[in-house]
A protein has these predicted regions:
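A structured phosphate/pyrophosphate-recognition subdomain
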Residues: 158
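A short glycine-threonine-serine/GTX helix/turn-capping micro-motif
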Residues: 149-155
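Extended, subdomain-level signal for the structured scaffold at the beginning of enzyme domains
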Residues: 1-98, 105-110, 116, 127-132, ...
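Glycine/charged-rich beta-loop-alpha catalytic/anionic-binding loops adjacent to active sites
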Residues: 141-149
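Anionic-ligand binding patches
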Residues: 119
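NAD(P)-dependent dehydrogenases' Rossmann-like dinucleotide-binding region
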Residues: 124
Length: 199
């Protein structure tokens, strides 16, 4: 039996629940992916909406997996947490692909991983995100961005659109459309079609 590719979901307290639960719904339906939940030290992590997830220490993760990081109010202290940033930088840098949702891109930017790359983020937090990553080519109008192995989405629900786009890139458009239909989701297939564009 062929080994599944690990999807390493990195969590921290006060992450935004839909940032992760939406993309997980998509990724778990893709053939050959296995979902794993991690944090710096392991244990129970609580989302901003008080959902609890039992995580393992990130140090047990497959470095070559797919690294996924959400946003949410927990990213505000996270960008100043040197221990967490060191771990995030290592695993995101070594990953085969790196996906961030909402203000998760601010954390990647703080690690220097998005320097010189195109990226986007939650439009309501855009000023703060820009201040974190001044060397990033931030796109104010984008549902999601792809630059090399890095995928970054706009706020919250945009993570589902981005993840379906990621699936289309990996497995073909038909696979992504089928998953969207399976979850009864109206997919915005155009990464530049951003109804929440920052004016």
């Amino acid at each position: 039996m062929e080994r599944k590719t690990d999807v390493n979901i990195f969590l921290f307290d006060d992450f935004e629940t839909l940032d992760i639960f939406g993309p997980i719904e998509v990724l778990a339906r893709a053939e050959g992916y296995g979902i794993k939940y991690y944090s710096v030290s392991g244990g129970i992590i609580r989302s901003a909406q008080n959902a609890e997830i039992l995580t393992e220490s990130i140090h047990h993760a497959d470095e070559n997996g797919i690294f996924v990081i959400p946003g949410g109010r927990g990213t505000r202290p996270l960008v100043n947490d040197s221990e967490s940033l060191s771990v995030i930088k290592k695993y995101a840098d070594l990953s085969a692909y790196c996906l961030s949702i909402c203000t998760g891109s601010a954390v990647l930017a703080k690690c220097g991983l998005l320097d010189g790359r195109q990226a986007t983020s939650n439009k309501k937090a855009f000023d703060w995100v820009e201040s974190i990553g001044e060397k990033v080519n931030w796109k104010k109008k984008a549902r999601w961005c792809k630059d090399g192995k890095f995928y970054t989405s706009s706020g919250v629900s945009a993570g589902i659109d981005m993840t379906l786009g990621f699936i289309a890139d990996r497995f073909g458009m038909e696979s992504a459309v089928n998953i969207a239909e399976d979850i009864e989701y109206i997919w915005n297939k155009d990464s530049d079609n951003d109804p929440f564009e920052r004016k």
